[in-house]
Amino acid sequence: MSRINNADTPTNRRNLSLARGRRRLTYSPSTPMPTPRQTRAPMPTPRQRRSLTPEHVVGDRNAPLRASYTINNSRYNVHGDAEFNPPEDDDDSIIFTDHAAEQARQRAVNLHESLTTTPRSPDYSPVHSPSGQVIDSDDYNSDDDERMLEQILLESAEPPQTPQPAPEPQEDVEVLCHICSCTFTDIKNYNSNFVTSSECNHAVCFKCYVSIVFNKEAYKCSICNRTTLTCRAYNRAGYVELSTVRTVRDNKLIKQHWMQLTESNMPHNRDKTIIEELQLELADLRATTARAHHEVNMIKSDNLLLQQQVDFKNLELQQELNAKVKLQKQNDTLSAANTFLQNQLDAQVAESKIKMDQFVRQHEAFLKKFKSSVM
C-alpha cells in the first residue's frame, strides 16, 4: 500500500520527521572549551552531502524547490506543485526536509559559527543588549542556539494561505435606457453599458451620452436637468471619469470607424467570409470589366478621330495633287511659249546678223568710194 507524504498529510509523521531532522542537523556545543577553534569541527557543507547522495528531481526543475525527501540514501527534490508518491518502505527510512526550514537552519548554524569562531580583538568589549544585560560569547549554550533556531524557523515559515473566495455566478440582466428605449444585456456586478452623472447618478446608455455631450463642454442630465463636467463609466474594478475634450464634425469618420469594425471586429464565419471574398472579387472583376469597356470606347473614339484626320489629310493631298497638275500644265504652257519666243529671238538674231553683215559690206564699199572720190 503506497503512502503519500506531502504538506497536506494530517499525520504526526511529518512533524516527527521534521523534528528528527532538526535534532540531527542542529549543532550546539555540549561543553564549553577554552577556544572555539579547538572545539568546533568544520561541518560538512550541503554541497558535500548532496554529492554523496543521489538526487532525483520531481516536477519542473525551473520551478521553486518546495520540499525534499530522503528515502534509502536517495534524495527526492519536489519542485512547484508536483505531487510525489514515495515508494513503499518503512516510515523510519523516509526523512522529510522542508526547504525553507533547511535554509533557516543553515543561517542559524552560520550565525552560531560566526559568533563562536570569531577571535576577540584586543579592544573587545561586551555587547550590551537593550534590556541592559551583557551578552558575551562565553554565556552562550545549546539552549540559546535552540531558541535562536526556533525563532528563525518561525520567522522563515510561510504564512498560511487564505482560501480564495469562490467567484460569483454571472447573471445576465436586461437594462432599459429611458432616452432611446433600447435594451442592453449586461452581466450583473461585472460590467455596464451605461454612463452615470457624478451629480445625480442617473444612468443613460453610452450612445445617448455621446449624443448629449457632442459639441458641448458639460453633460446635462435629461431626467433632472443637472449639469456636470464629468460622468462615470463602471466595471467590476471601479469606475472611470469621462469628460468632453474635443469634438470633430465629419460624416466620413463614422464610415471609417465602421470600415475598421467590419475588417477587424466582426464575428468570424467561414462561409460568410468566403461569400464576402467572392463578392469583393466579383466587384473587382466588374470594375476591371468596366475599365476595359471604357478603354475600348476610348480607343474606338481615338480610332475614329484618327480616321477623320486621315481622310482630311487625304483630301488635302488630293487638293495638292490637283494643284500640282494645274501648275504642271501651266509650266508646260509657259515652256512652249518660251520655246516659241526663243525661236523667234534666234530668227531675229540671225536676220539681224545678216543685215549687219550687209551693212558692214555696204559701209566698206562706201568708204572705198569716198576715198577714191577724195583722191
Swiss-Prot record:
Reaction equation(s) it catalyzes: S-ubiquitinyl-[E2 ubiquitin-conjugating enzyme]-L-cysteine + [acceptor protein]-L-lysine = [E2 ubiquitin-conjugating enzyme]-L-cysteine + N(6)-ubiquitinyl-[acceptor protein]-L-lysine
Origin superkingdom: Viruses
Chain spans, region Disordered: 1-61, 115-142
SUPFAM superfamilies assigned: RING/U-box
Compositional bias annotation for Polar residues: 1-12
InterPro entries linked to this entry: Znf_RING (IPR001841), Znf_RING_CS (IPR017907)
Signal peptide start-end: none
Function per UniProt: RING-finger E3 ubiquitin ligase that plays an important regulatory role during the initial stages of infection. Migrates to specific nuclear foci early in infection supposely to prepare the sites for viral replication by targeting and ubiquitinating host proteins.
Protein name: E3 ubiquitin-protein ligase IE2
